[in-house]
From Swiss-Prot:
The lineage of its organism: Bacteria, Pseudomonadati, Pseudomonadota, Alphaproteobacteria, Rickettsiales. This is Purine nucleoside phosphorylase RC0672. Belongs to the purine nucleoside phosphorylase YfiH/LACC1 family. CDD domains: YfiH. It catalyses: adenosine + phosphate = alpha-D-ribose 1-phosphate + adenine; S-methyl-5'-thioadenosine + phosphate = 5-(methylsulfanyl)-alpha-D-ribose 1-phosphate + adenine; inosine + phosphate = alpha-D-ribose 1-phosphate + hypoxanthine; adenosine + H2O + H(+) = inosine + NH4(+). SUPFAM superfamilies: CNF1/YfiH-like putative cysteine hydrolases (SSF64438). Zn(2+) binds at residues 60, 96, 113. GO terms for molecular function: adenosine deaminase activity; copper ion binding; oxidoreductase activity; S-methyl-5-thioadenosine phosphorylase activity. Its cofactor is Cu(2+); Zn(2+). Gene3D superfamilies: CNF1/YfiH-like putative cysteine hydrolases (3.60.140.10). Its EC number is 2.4.2.1, 3.5.4.4, 2.4.2.28. The keyword Zinc applies.
Length: 240
């Protein structure tokens, strides 16, 4: 457990080295049973000595859930914010960029799943706006482990989509050895979006999920190796 704001806000990246979980947190198919999910969530709440945990049904979008409001079903969203103590906010990832946020006074927290679709469609500015509207100031952010530029090859259509949003996005791409393909720096893009939104205090873990198979699940690595993709990193934050 890392102290983001000692005495009030803590976070942890639950990777493969955390042995008290099978690293499955949402039931998306019949290969995952409900008991397994319940036990995995319980292991996280026990670790933090917290009361509850909110894990979203992520859809690679830009919607943010206010977890202060009553939530009955698992929300379809890619970010959450709260002022509640002992409520863990968590996002799953396996190459996409997890972002954890806290106000400088330790009274508001947030978590976002920033894949390329969510990132290009302003999920970072959305969550910063939402958390600021609740009174957060002097935001602190953690960028969790994600796929690095050296591991992330994309095609020309993807490249053009980013440049159509802003020609300056060209800085995040370098040519691949494969014709009409590029290597994209998604974590750097997310970091810039945090800075543009006014976040100055940013901790970037800067570890490549693709090249660390013993520590991190990677959807792209699993695809390339023709292996099942059935685990996720869980990036979690809580106020005490």
């Amino acid at each position: 457990m890392e102290g983001l704001i000692n005495g009030s806000v803590y976070y942890k990246i639950f990777d493969k080295t955390f042995n008290n979980s099978s690293h499955r947190y949402i039931k998306k198919n019949n290969s995952i049973n409900e008991t397994e999910i319940v036990e995995n969530k319980k292991s996280i709440t026990t670790y933090f000595k917290a009361q509850d945990i909110l894990i979203l049904n992520q859809v690679h979008g830009n919607q943010i859930v206010n977890a202060d409001e009553s939530i009955i079903a698992v929300p379809e969203a890619d970010g959450s914010i709260t002022t509640k103590k002992n409520l863990i906010l968590a996002v799953q990832s396996a190459d996409c960029v997890p972002v954890l946020l806290a106000s400088g006074d330790g009274k508001i927290i947030g978590a976002a799943h920033a894949g390329w679709k969510g990132s290009i469609n302003n999920i970072i500015s959305n969550i910063v706006t939402k958390i600021t509207e609740k009174g957060a100031k002097n935001l602190i952010a953690v960028i969790g482990p994600a796929i690095a530029q050296s591991s992330y090859e994309v095609d020309d259509e993807y490249y053009k989509a980013f440049l159509s949003k802003d020609i300056n996005n060209k800085q995040f791409f370098i040519h691949s050895i494969k014709e009409n393909h590029y290597m994209f720096d998604l974590p750097a893009f997310v970091e810039l979006k945090l800075k543009e939104a006014g976040v100055k205090d940013i901790k970037n873990i800067a570890e490549d999920t693709y090249t660390n198979p013993l520590k991190y699940p990677s959807k792209r690595r699993s695809y390339h190796l023709q292996e099942p993709y059935n685990q996720n990193i869980l990036s979690a934050i809580v106020m005490k």
